[in-house]
C-alpha cells in the first residue's frame, strides 16, 4: 500500500507540473529526457526506502550456548543436537534460548566462541568434545558466574585447577558406552556363530589358529576407546569363543578418508564384522559397499541408527542417549537443584543403548540382547572398564579377558 500511495503522489505531482507549465517556453528534448530520468530515479528511491529493514536489528540472546566440533551432517554431533533439542522440549525451554556454534576449533577457537556466547547472555555453555577440555577449564576459571559442561573421554576428570582451586561451575560428563559396546559385541558374536554354523565364512577370514577375524577402527588410542574395544570384544566372546580382533587407530575424529582407508584394510584382510569408535560413518559405508559386492562383511555402527545407509551390512549401533543427561542438567538449573559435577551414565540411567537390530542380525539375537541388557541394568552383570591398550593393536581370544 505504501508503494502505491507514493507512486500516485508522484504521478499527481508530475501532472500538476505539466499543467502549470503549459504557458512556458517548450523544453528541448534533452531537458525533457533529463527530467524524466530524474523523476524515475526519485520514484525508485522512494520505493526502495520503504523496503529497507531496520538497521539496528536486535541481536539474538540466549540462555544456553552450545559449542560443537562438527555439524548435523556428522553422526556424533547430530546425536548431541537431537539430545539437546529433546531435553529442551522436555523442560519447555524455547528453541530461541539456545545458541549454536558449529565446527569450532580447539583452544583459541573454543575460547573465542565462549566469549561470544557470554556476550550474548548465555549462562550455561556446553562443549561436546574432549578437545575443548583445557580451554573450557580456563574459561570456567575466568567466568565463575557461568556454568560450563564438557563431554569427556574418561570416567574421571578433575574440576580442580593447577593452583588447587575447585571450579564449582565446571561439569564433566562421560557416557559409559563400553556397556553398550559389550551388548553390541553380543550381537556381532551371534552373527559370527550363525555364519560359522552355516559354513559361510571364507577361508581368508580365519587366522592360523582358526579364529574368525573381526575388525575395529578407533579414532584415538585413549582410555575410552580401549574400554569400548575390550568390552565389545568380550561381548563377542560371550557367544563365540574363537575370534581375534584387529584394531586400527587412525588418530583423527573427523576424517572420513582415514576411516575408509582403515576399514578397507580390515576388509581386505578378511574381517567379517567391523565396529568403530569414531565420529563419522565411513566404516559403515565401507562395510555396506563390500556387502553389495558380495563380500562376507557386516558392521556395528556408532552414535546413531545406521540401518538406512547400510541396510545389508548393519547389525546394530552403539548409541548414547544424550537427552537423558541434558534433561537432567536443564531441569536442575531451572529449578535450582543440585547437579553432579562428574556425571557418568550407562544402562542404569538409560543413557546408553544399542539401536534397533538390522535385518542381517541373526535370529534369536533380540532375546539374547534383551536378557543381557536387563542383567546390566539391574547390576547382575558388571561390565569392566578395561582401559589398557590392546597389545600390537590385536586382541587374541586367549588374552582377551586380561586386556
Region spans (language model):
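Sec-dependent N-terminal signal peptides of Gram-positive bacterial secreted proteins and lipoproteins
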Residues: 2-25
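A residue-level marker of the well-folded mature domains of exported/periplasmic proteins
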Residues: 29, 34-403
